Amino acid sequence: MNRLSVAGAIISLFLAATPAVAQQASRCADCHFAQNTVPNPDHLYDWDRSPHARNNVGCEKCHGGNATVFEASIAHRGILNPANKQSPVNRANLPATCGGCHVGPFVAFQDSRHYELLKGGDQHGPTCSTCHDPVAGQLLSPKALEKQCSQCHGPKEVAPRAERARNARQMYESLNAIRDQLKLANAMIKRVDDKQRRADLMNEYEQASVPMTRAINAGHKFVYGELDEYLKVAQERVEKLMAHIANRAN
């Protein structure tokens, strides 16, 4: 029995002695971090710093496989190369895979022209990883997003309306600014001592968050007129909320 097999046997005995709930945790990263020859380690490092890792959304949730064992042949059984059209992380299947958790954005994306292109086999059709980090999930910066959009809506004129790339950047800059204001407001509300005032402010915070959610969904439909309208409503509500927090208005 080689050293890896012995280590696997010891780990298996340890897992057998742990509660059933703990055994359900994803073990992919544990094994991959222990190997010096794992391909594409940056992929693993990105995941480890991501909200996915913090919420125990392991590799198997997207790639498949068995995340409860340490024997590579068993753990990797059923995992397909992303180039395989049956793979859940193939670019055409990625929206449905991500949509298993991110339902709202997936439903909105299905209403877009981009989704039609993607499902029709158009290689220019964007998928989730076009705009989001494929592992960490964060949206690209507004400038990086503009660059992505300009590959089609730009000088090459693969698609019409070259101004859309610039408009997308500007709108996502606004979205990020409002999101930062909401984050600040939430932190300030939590420090309010009076329970009734804190509850009233939190209700106002939630009302300001509604158009933000709708703006994000409009972004996933790529309907930028709708996105802009929701951002204006969100901005108005956030400004009013911040004034109330500062006690400048009733």
Per-segment meaning from a language model:
Residues 7-17:
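Bacterial N-terminal signal peptides
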